[in-house]
Each structure stands twice: as structure tokens, then as C-alpha cells.
């Protein structure tokens, strides 16, 4: 039972919802860093422990996941979006086997690092990480639009990006039951809903004529290109895992 609670604590955003959201003692950037570190800790723990998560904990994780989905579709802040998506995917990180959870967790974290960096780009050039008024970036800033599209498409579980391949691999490696089917449907369509909501206007909408658009500078573009290459490598790993 203790291991179950530790896994829930590390993956599902429990410290954020119980403490940091209420007190505001950490900024949005630091919350993302801390959340990512906790998830990495959970992935390490899952690889050194053979413990099977109990169904009550999975149900709690699913309930927390639905709450995170609600928060994700309500926020316009890209920093918040990055860690809400991380919390939303907690049931899969808990329910997958150690190897499958690790692969999915790594690809998820890399995609979210990309989203987080896009939040920093927004904050630096538009005054905040809020994407609501900065619409149509693909037409106005092609490089920023391309990278945002890549990260959101990966998070929406579209192949050939690694998130979808690792997600499918985790499902194929698991012993499915009714709870599994419910979790898979929630996570799959939830990720899709979150990504499409942002892409509809922010990425593919009409540019706001009141905004002076600034594209990614070469240094930023290089960082995002490296992240994209790593995602491609993970896609190859995902294909290999599916073929084994």
C-alpha cells in the first residue's frame, strides 16, 4: 500500500493540488521542474520495484486525471498546460509495466519540455505565457508554429511520433480489463482534446492584427530542432518495441 501511495504522489500531481496550487509558494516554471523531477523519480522507482499497483489507487489516479483534464482545457497559460498534461497522463504511467511506463514517460516529458520552452518564448516576446490572444502563429511565425504543431501532435498521440507508439506498446504489453479500457479511452481522447483546443486558434487560427509577432531566434530554433531529433529517435525505438 505504501508503494501505491508513493506512486500516486509522484505521478498524479498530488503535491501541486494539495499544497502549491493553494499557497502559491512556487512559480509556474518551478512547478513544472519539480513535477518533471517527481515523475522521473516515479519512473526510476517503477524500475527497481516489482510492486503491482492496486485498483483503488488506479481509480484515484483516474479521478485526479479527469480533474487535470478539466484544468488543462480551462487554462490558457502554456506553463500550466505543460504540467496539467503531465498529471493527466498519470494513470498510464502507473498502469503500464516498468519498461513501457519509462518509454512513454520519457517521450511525454520531452514533448512537454518543448511545450514549456514555447511558453518561455511566448513570455519573452508577448509579455506572458498566455496563448489566448496570440493566434495564428503558423501564418505569422512559421518556425514557432511548426514546433508548436509538432509538440501538440505528439501529445495528441498521433503516429509516427513516439508518444503514440509508446502508448500503443504499453497497451499491447498489458493484460487488459474493464478499468484498462476506461483508462485508455480517457487518456487517448483527453490528450487529443487538449491538443486540438490549442491548435484550433493558437496554431492554425487567424493572426491577431494587434500583435507584433516575433519568430523563434536561431538559438531557440536549434534547441527545438535537437528536441525534434530526439523525438524521432524515440519514434524509431517505439517502432522497434512494437516489432519485438
Identify the residue ranges that each predicted region occupies:
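Alpha-helical transmembrane segments of multi-pass membrane proteins predominantly involved
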Residues: 1-244
Amino acid at each position: 500500500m505504501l508503494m501505491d501511495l508513493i506512486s500516486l504522489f509522484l505521478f498524479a500531481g498530488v503535491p501541486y493540488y494539495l499544497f502549491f496550487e493553494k499557497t502559491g509558494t512556487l512559480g509556474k516554471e518551478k512547478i513544472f521542474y519539480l513535477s518533471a523531477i517527481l515523475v522521473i523519480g516515479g519512473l526510476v522507482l517503477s524500475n527497481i520495484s516489482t510492486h503491482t499497483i492496486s485498483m483503488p489507487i488506479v481509480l484515484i489516479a483516474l479521478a485526479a486525471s479527469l480533474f487535470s483534464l478539466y484544468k488543462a482545457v480551462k487554462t490558457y497559460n502554456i506553463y500550466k498546460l505543460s504540467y496539467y498534461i503531465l498529471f493527466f497522463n498519470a494513470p498510464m504511467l502507473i498502469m503500464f509495466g516498468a519498461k513501457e511506463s519509462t518509454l512513454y514517460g520519457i517521450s511525454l516529458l520531452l514533448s512537454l519540455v518543448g511545450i514549456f520552452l514555447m511558453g518561455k518564448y511566448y513570455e519573452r516576446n508577448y509579455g506572458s505565457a498566455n496563448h489566448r490572444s496570440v493566434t495564428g502563429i503558423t501564418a505569422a511565425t512559421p518556425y514557432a508554429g511548426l514546433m508548436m504543431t509538432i509538440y501538440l501532435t505528439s501529445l495528441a498521440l498521433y503516429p509516427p511520433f513516439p508518444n503514440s507508439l509508446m502508448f500503443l506498446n504499453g497497451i499491447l504489453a498489458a493484460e487488459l480489463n474493464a478499468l484498462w479500457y476506461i483508462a485508455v479511452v480517457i487518456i487517448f481522447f483527453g490528450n487529443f482534446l487538449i491538443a486540438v483546443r490549442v491548435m484550433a486558434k493558437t496554431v492554425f487560427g487567424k493572426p491577431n492584427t494587434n500583435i507584433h509577432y516575433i519568430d523563434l531566434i536561431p538559438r531557440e530554433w536549434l534547441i527545438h530542432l535537437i528536441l525534434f531529433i530526439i523525438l524521432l529517435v524515440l519514434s524509431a525505438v517505439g517502432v522497434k518495441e512494437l516489432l519485438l
